[in-house]
Regions:
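Tandem repeat scaffolds
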Residues: 1-192
Length: 192
């Protein structure tokens, strides 16, 4: 079990239940979290550096001031996470085959982020820097992009996205048909 105000390094944490528990001000460096439950956990001002979360549940975590620096999430369920409340300076996550539902990534610098193989359902991106982001094999059902920089982002194998080129920068972003037709919705165009 992790003690109060812990500073852990190079640890493998397996099947731990942190649900509704506080990890406030804890520091984790080069740690692996496998099959852990962080639902509704308090991660205020916690620091995760070069950590990997595999098959973890992060539903409704409290992320005020939390730092995710060079962190990978693999096969995780992340619901209702307000990532915009995280420490913005060092925010550098990578998501692989994750379920991200109702998450908010507004006002973040997510340049070169990868969401590879993930499902982003009704997530929110406003004023987000997503230059060179990888949305490979990503389902973006109901996800909103507003005033984002999507330049050089790769949506070529993404599905169910609805991006308005009038409110987002999409210069040199990659799209493919038939999904790219969604780029015309904001213009009131009818395609037959």
């Amino acid at each position: 079990m992790i003690k109060r105000s812990s500073n852990l390094e190079n640890q493998v944490i397996q099947s731990e239940n942190f649900s509704k528990k506080s990890l406030e001000n804890h520091v984790f460096n080069s740690c692996s979290f496998n099959s852990c439950d962080f639902s509704e956990s308090l991660l205020r001002n916690a620091h995760f550096g070069t950590c990997i979360f595999t098959n973890c549940n992060l539903s409704l975590p409290k992320l005020d001031g939390c730092r995710f620096q060079e962190v990978r999430f693999v096969d995780c369920k992340i619901v209702g996470a307000e990532f915009f409340k995280c420490e913005k300076t060092f925010f550098s996550p990578k998501f692989e085959n994750c379920l991200l539902h109702y998450c908010n990534f507004s006002d973040l610098n997510m340049k070169k982020v990868s969401f590879s193989g993930s499902k982003l359902k009704e997530c929110h991106f406003t004023n987000t820097n997503l230059i060179s982001a990888d949305f490979g094999e990503v389902d973006l059902s109901g996800t909103v992009f507003h005033n984002c920089d999507l330049s050089l982002a790769d949506f070529a194998s993404a599905v169910r996205y609805d991006i308005d080129p009038q409110t987002n920068k999409i210069k040199k972003a990659r799209f493919s048909l038939p999904e790219a037709v969604g780029l015309l919705r904001g213009f009131g165009v009818t395609i037959v």
